[in-house]
Amino acid sequence: MTARPLRRARRDVGAAPFIVIWEATRACPLACLHCRAEARPDRHPGELSTHEARELMRQVAAFGRPAPLFVITGGDPFERPDLFDLVRYGRELGLAPSVSPSATPALTPANLSRLHEAGAAAISLSVDAATAARHDEFRGYDGVFSRTLAAWRAARQAGLKVQINTTVTRRNLSQLPDIARLVRDHGAMLWSVFFLVPTGRGRALAALSPQEAEDVLHFVHDLGTVVPVKTTEAHHFRRVAVQRLILAERGADHAAELGLGPLYRDLRRRARRAGLIRERRARRPPVDVNAGRGLVFVSHTGSVHPSGFLPVACGDVRERPLTEIYRNAPLFRALRDPGRLSGRCGACEFRAVCGGSRSRAYACTGDVFAEEPWCGYQPGSFPYQRELTPYLPQEEARER
């Protein structure tokens, strides 16, 4: 074995999450087509108060060192007047808060500077097309694209790291090479390519076929030679990374061996023409987290979920500590056991490094342990099974 294609968590994800996402509010003036939260213009009266939000952050810090990543999302977090104070308090606790704002008029250079001064480590911005017309249509308002690009520049000038999020749907597949070029040219610490989960307003958007998803995953892997990129709710990207490393070591044609389609070939051709692909090893995918396995989501009203895209409440931070819910809630414990998976995911040799999107499985079937709907891989079909052994971890014993 000459390289490790995957990063491994340096913590016991049964004891502490890698990332905690807090939905600070659902208030947001935009009307994005894919919005998980189905955001509303006004704040909900049952949102966590400032005092309760501080207590939540103390609970996050109680997971110990290294502290989980702590992301404040929405709606639009700028709808909360206590946002800067909460970021500052999180920093005092030893957290490194990141903020995921919407591209509203509140996203000004002054507010971005205040976020940095309060102690925010990074922000994430959404770019779902490479042109103003296409992006603004997706977001529901004119001017959002130009405001996003201006905020991108202002955030970097203020000293904030910037992550760019892109939701992949049938509407913007052809835009992916151009969005990648924006990420390269403007600079970002990470490009997060999110595979749509049909929740909230996103239920109305057309799903990718498994073949299209596979083509996009391999295209994203190719971009990793130039652009720092990861996937969200596309856990089979880790399978792709293992397959591609083994095929590269054998000098095999990955497109032919894996039956990649015309979408992949078109995206790759356009990206190569733009200088977005080089003949060198791609960056490894970030640490694997999945719903309830390294990831926990706290809603605006305090309910705790394995993911923001898996709407099954497992407790409430107003009633039980977050540490207790994450470690002991039956669904969280079950989600950390690959042996609970069914269908092709349950039979797959990659299940311990992938596991499929539990959120998408639930959204499409009502069964959180069902097979990943956007994965077309047939277990056992990879032709070099013997070479897989060093890359696939031994599965942990089931949590009792």
Say what each PLM segment does.
Residues I19-I21, L69-V71, A96-S98, A122-S124, ...:
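Structural preference for beta-strand elements that scaffold enzyme active sites
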Residues H44-L48, S357-F369, R386-P390:
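Short cysteine/histidine-rich zinc-coordinating motifs and their immediately flanking basic loops
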Residues H236-G380:
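Accessory C-terminal segments flanking Radical SAM cores
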Residues M1-A118:
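Conserved alpha-helical substructure of the radical SAM core
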Residues Q59-G74, E372-R400:
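Short Fe-S-cluster ligation motifs
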Residues T50, R80, A106-P109, A132, ...:
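Structural motif corresponding to alpha-helix initiation and N-cap regions
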Residues R43-H44, H116-A118, S126-D128, A133-N290:
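Radical SAM enzyme [4Fe-4S]-AdoMet core and its adjacent flexible, acidic
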